[in-house]
Amino acid sequence: MQYSNYHSHCDFCDGRSFPEDFVKFAIRNGFRAYGFSSHSPLPFETFWNMSKEDMNEYLAEIRRLKEKYADKLEIYCGLEIDFLDKTYNASIPYFQELPLDYRISSIHYLPLQMPLEEENMMCIDGSYDAFKISTEEYYGGDIRKVVRHFYQSSCEMVEAGGFDVVGHLDKIYMNGQRFPGFSLDAEWYKKEFFNCLDLIQEKGLMVEVNTKNYVKKRELFPHQAFLKCLKERNIPVMVNSDCHYPDLVNDGREAAFDFLKDAGYKNTCELVKGVWREVALE
């Protein structure tokens, strides 16, 4: 089995270590390929996104590591790019003109009103307390409205394009499942989720199986209960750890492989000499 990871955060954003530390871990643990995907710049400052001012240094550092470890590991430079709306996403010229090997697109924020500033956003990837307050204040306490907004934004992200991989597709359930009235089994929830899957299938995009929460909570994104639904649509997948610490690079990977096999997958997608290819799940 060939190990690879393409969703990774270092000290250029909210990661907790230098890029080279992740590379060294990957080499020690037999990885064939490793990709960096720092949180992209946003129109506003956050503690977890990198700034545009740091972009050239980020690109240069990953390029340096590519050259230094060329005989030991395939290293790739990507970004995890936030979809905010049709005016700020992976498809805009700024992100398209960057010399990246790949792009992941994810949703962390739901815009509540203009302009695109942090105080006008609902963060779906923060604390439950903040999530609950925003749900009550802006959605009348109706979790269905939040889920609908999330998947509408997800579909707009897929339509906008400009990226290779859908990041943590159903992250809304992380906090949503703690809210009264939410259930992954509910027909209203599955309708929103499946509509998004159908569009991903139509556009031919890859979806990551994100293992970040697996060790602590035994949960994947997309949730393992839905991996068969991806397979039924022949949606290509890869396994990423979304790690922020080097020693967490491999967390949950073997479990994700097992879930994928159970769902009927025979292959995952990997970059091989710069080209996306299917690699056997052995």
Where are these regions (language model features)?
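Conserved beta-strand termini and adjacent loop/short-helix elements that scaffold enzyme active sites
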Residues: 78, 210-212, 270-273
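Conserved, mostly hydrophobic/aromatic
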Residues: 7, 26, 103, 168, ...
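Extended hydrophobic/aromatic segments used for targeting, binding, or gating
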Residues: 191-195, 209-243, 251-258
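Hydrophobic residues within beta-strands of alpha/beta enzymes
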Residues: 34-36, 103, 166, 207, ...
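Extended substrate/RNA-proximal surfaces in nucleic-acid metabolism proteins
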Residues: 55-202
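An N-terminally biased module of ancient metal coordination in phosphate/nucleic-acid-related enzymes
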Residues: 1-85, 89-97, 173-187, 234, ...
